[in-house]
From Swiss-Prot:
A Pfam family reported for this protein in Swiss-Prot or TrEMBL: Glyco_transf_20
Binding positions for D-glucose 6-phosphate per the UniProt entry: R10, Y81, D135, R306
Organism (species): Sinorhizobium fredii (strain NBRC 101917 / NGR234)
EC number: 2.4.1.15
Biological or metabolic pathway of the protein: Glycan biosynthesis; trehalose biosynthesis
Group of enzyme by EC: transferase
Keywords: Glycosyltransferase, Plasmid, Transferase
Record keyword Isomerase present: no
Protein name: Trehalose-6-phosphate synthase
Length: 464
């Protein structure tokens, strides 16, 4: 079996006990390495300095996984990560042209850091290694590795949406981005819609096309484009939730909710998540259903994210102020309608909180997949499952047929879905939950990993 080398922007470094920070992508990639019998996971350490040259690559061995960590300079972080990756690629891929900020310095920094990553990675790679690169910060990495002479099989998976041509082409370096993807042997997307958008971009620009059989051509190269819907550790997460009832934090939450119905939302603080629209919909739901006053609690867990980017800092203030306004307008001495937590919660505790939720609110304006939706479903009690209210613009909506799909821009429609969820008969809730749970058990994170790597190792057409 070929050794697997994973490259991602950040690497979740295990602590002394071997426990890595929890998160959807982190968990998925660790499972991928474990199922391949180990390998290398390389990426940014999260550390930076004002030095012109970062410290040498650090390697940490945990079991059969080698974590290869590189520092970056302060300039690198600002231009590559906070700059081009998160002020250009992220908003463009989430259809937010109004938030994209183009700068030549940031664009140059993005490609420079990818070249730096390639130079740090290349000495670690053996001829028969399979390299799996993840997400938008590292799109040009394969091109840099090919330039250095590496002929390994290299795959890329995009965790966020791929936009339509008319959106992508507003980006000055869109052709360089598409050229970068053509250097991979397999390019994976979350949904068929994303793959169709990518193929359309190739055609519209006159640089390639879909050849059939999952093959794409671009810049004289042939590579595979595929859809690989990322999953979760379904069975394990369900067990977390089942056992979490004895957790002290979960117990306190259950006691504080008392007999009220819990509506729960869990999202990073990001403008793509539709948080302001969701809070407005909750307010509309209470105003339209006065009998629910004092009988429902909305818990929104929203860890801080990318605070160095001005748009995120501004949004943090906006969401906190909106939550305060709703509580001030609707609350009573003995009832706080909305609880807003602006920090991370441990994964096992989160599983228990999901299980308490009668309604799971997952209403992003645009999302590649959204693993929170899948975790909420997996955490439910089969005898009394909650209802998932899911944005039609989340990639997960194409898989979770038992959810109540909503348009997050339709405030009244989302409010109505909350009301319907809380009044839904048990039999219908169980039927919807069973449909979704069966899907999640069949298409879990192991299946995602296996499908992608099987296609990558079977690929016969190399880039270069």
């Amino acid at each position: 079996m070929s050794r697997l080398v994973i490259v991602s922007n950040r690497v979740p470094v295990p602590d002394k006990g071997g426990i890595a920070p929890a998160g959807g992508l982190a968990v998925a990639l660790k499972v991928a390495l474990e199922e391949q019998g180990g390998g290398i996971w390389m990426g940014w350490s999260g550390k930076s300095s004002g030095e012109d040259e970062p410290a040498p690559l650090a390697q940490l061995q945990q079991g059969n996984i080698t974590y290869a960590l590189t520092d970056l300079t302060d300039t690198d972080v600002e231009e590559y990560y906070h700059g081009f990756a998160n002020r250009v690629l992220w908003p463009i891929c989430h259809y937010r042209l109004d938030l994209a900020e183009y700068g030549r310095k940031e664009m140059a920094g993005y490609f420079r850091v990818n070249r730096f990553f390639a130079h740090r990675l290349a000495p670690l790679v053996k001829p028969d290694d399979v390299i799996w690169v993840h997400d938008y910060p590292l799109i040009p990495l394969a091109a840099e590795l090919r330039q250095m002479g590496l002929e390994n099989r290299i795959g890329f998976f995009l965790h966020i949406p791929w936009p339509p041509a008319d959106v992508l082409f507003t980006m000055p370096v869109h052709e360089e981005i598409m050229r970068g993807l053509s250097h991979y042997d397999v390019v994976g997307f979350q949904t068929d819609h994303d793959l169709e958008n990518f193929a359309s971009c190739l055609r519209r620009e006159g640089i390639g096309d879909a050849l059939g059989g999952g093959r794409l051509s671009a810049y004289g190269r042939i590579f595979k484009g595929g859809v690989y819907a990322i999953g979760i550790e379904t069975a394990a997460f369900a067990e977390f939730a089942k056992k979490a009832s004895t957790n002290s934090t979960v117990k306190k939450a259950r006691e504080s909710i008392e007999r009220r119905s819990l509506i729960i939302g869990v999202d990073r603080l990001d403008y793509s998540k539709g948080l302001t629209q969701r809070i407005e919909a909750f307010e509309r739901f209470i105003l339209a259903n006065p009998a629910q006053r004092g009988r429902v609690t909305y818990l929104q867990i929203t860890p801080k994210s990318r605070s160095e980017v001005p748009e995120y800092e501004a949004m943090q203030r906006t969401v906190a102020e909106q939550a305060g306004r709703v509580n001030g307008a609707l609350g009573a001495v003995d009832w706080v309608p909305m609880r807003y937590i602006n920090r991370s919660v441990g994964r096992r505790v989160l599983a228990g909180l999901y299980r308490l939720g009668k309604v799971g609110l997952v209403t992003p304006l645009r999302d590649g997949k959204n693993l929170v939706a899948k975790e909420y479903v997996a955490a439910q009690d089969p005898d009394d499952p909650g209802v998932l209210v899911l944005s039609r613009f989340a990639g997960a909506a194409r898989e979770l047929q038992g959810a109540l799909l909503v348009n997050p821009y339709d405030i009244e429609g989302t409010a109505n879905a909350m009301a319907r969820s809380l009044s839904m008969p048990l039999e219908e809730r169980q039927e919807r939950w069973t449909t979704m749970m069966d899907q999640l058990l069949e298409h879990d994170v192991s299946r995602w990993c296996r499908d992608f790597l099987n296609d990558l190792t079977a690929s016969s057409d190399r880039c270069g």
